[in-house]
Regions:
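Active-site core of glycosidic bond-cleaving carbohydrate-active enzymes
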Residues: 1-154, 191
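Non-catalytic C-terminal accessory modules of carbohydrate-active enzymes
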Residues: 106-232
Length: 233
């Protein structure tokens, strides 16, 4: 017990000089780590952006629920990129996911293109350098985030669809709650979505400003049109 208390005291002393999380840097970024805009930063374009974990892959920061934090996160990304951020493939992929969560389809597209043109080898391996698979997984994750975002009890379709992706379809995306999603779109608008719930599902489904409650029993499926109205299978 005494050793545990001593260890806690050492950790508290070590953590003492760090800025408290949740604040803002000098340029409106979330504070809490060196490089986030607090005085004394040495690498304003640093590749790690760990203080935005709450934006992606976490869900503590969102455009709808925490707009002020979302705006601060946007400023963080702008500041990092203005100072040379995203110079490794995995970091560029993470940045693309951040923009997807901020519903900025244009910047998502720009960063995916940079990932492919500047940080991808001819065999499609991500170039850190050297090869680092985080960039490959992160790039595909960003594509999925453009098409579907989900948190506990809520699913959003096509939240960050780039203008260049005018039409397409995708199958077997997986939303939180063990929900399988097939969807298609034309002219940048949802045309059809099929949802299957092996374990059952209850939550809210939204797309393009339209929302509806979704209740499915275990093993049940439903097919909806572009306005989220039910269609016959």
């Amino acid at each position: 017990v005494a050793a545990g208390r001593a260890g806690r005291r050492r950790r508290h002393r070590a953590a003492g000089p760090w800025p408290a999380g949740g604040g803002e840097g000098r340029r409106g970024q979330p504070g809490g780590q060196p490089g986030s805009g607090v005085p004394g930063q040495k690498e304003p374009g640093h590749r790690h952006i760990s203080h935005l974990y709450g934006l992606y892959p976490g869900h503590q920061i969102s455009v709808e629920e925490t707009p002020e934090l979302a705006q601060a996160a946007r400023r963080t990304l702008e500041y990092r990129l203005e100072n040379g951020g995203g110079h490794t493939g995995w970091s560029r992929a993470w940045i693309a996911n951040f923009w997807a969560r901020l519903h900025d389809a244009q910047k998502l597209q720009e960063n995916l293109e940079l990932l492919l043109t500047k940080s991808t080898l001819p065999n499609l391996f991500d170039n850190h350098p050297p090869f680092q698979i985080d960039g490959n997984f992160g790039g595909t994750a960003a594509i999925a985030q453009a098409l579907l975002q989900s948190s506990a009890g809520r699913i959003e379709l096509l939240p960050a669809l780039p203008e260049k992706w005018r039409e397409g379809c995708i199958r077997r995306l997986r939303a939180k709650g063990n929900l399988h999603v097939d969807l298609s779109w034309e002219n940048g608008r949802l045309t059809c979505v099929r949802l299957s719930a092996p374990s059952g599902y209850r939550g809210v489904l939204s797309c393009g400003g339209v929302s509806r409650e979704l209740i499915l029993r275990p093993g049940e499926s439903i097919r909806l049109d572009g306005r989220l109205q039910e269609r016959l299978e």
